[in-house]
Amino acid sequence: MKTFHGPTCGTAVSLCLLLFLTSALEEGEITSKVKFPPSSSPSFPRLVMVGTLPDLQEITLCYWFKVNCLKGTLHMFSYATAKKDNELLTLLDEQGDFLFNVHGAPQLKVQCPNKIHIGKWHHVCHTWSSWEGEATIAVDGFHCKGNATGIAVGRTLSQGGLVVLGQDQDSVGGKFDATQSLEGELSELNLWNTVLNHEQIKYLSKCAHPSERHIYGNIIQWDKTQFKAYDGVVLSPNEICA
């Protein structure tokens, strides 16, 4: 386990992260997790994706997460463009409810049957389709109450922005707020340009052995996509469901 500090080592960290994730999955027994320590200005632990996303009219975003506390708003995934800082945003509030923002439209807030437990791994999937504006959230394989239609109907998530994990961007790559950050861990984050069905989402939420996981994102793939680590992010091997 190694902690990387500061943007000056960003390029090297990207290579280390990619190599670490790849070798961990090839072992067939472990996957990798990323730990985000507490934020305190001017230190905002985060992962920043190398490159950008394409234009998207459908998405499924899934990941495993574990939180150390429920205070403020815990931002997991932020995609910001020059025109919209909340082009795509996922977060957890103090009540343990998930919020999902697509293309700057009103946030979808849901209550899930599975409560979020501090210190325990949970799996979440967010889906959205431009055609009817259907947006859903499922936690641990179960759909939440409050899923809706009419969210950003006919819109396209624009290419050219920046993906940040663990912080909320109020401008592209910046204007972070310590009360809008993740204190916890992420793993197995994948993004698709289509809406996965319920059976696929249920399968992803199971504690399957890494060698038995066959559904990986075609836009972001946890063991392939490169990220740069900043401000004390910790990378380590992990058995997700241990």
From Swiss-Prot:
Might serve the role of immunoglobulins. GO terms for molecular function: metal ion binding. PROSITE patterns: PTX_1 (PS00289), PTX_2 (PS51828). InterPro entries: ConA-like_dom_sf, Neuronal_Pentraxin_Related, Pentaxin_CS, Pentraxin-related. This is C-reactive protein 3.3. Keywords: Calcium, Disulfide bond, Glycoprotein, Metal-binding, Secreted, Signal. Binds 2 calcium ions per subunit. Glycans are attached at N147.
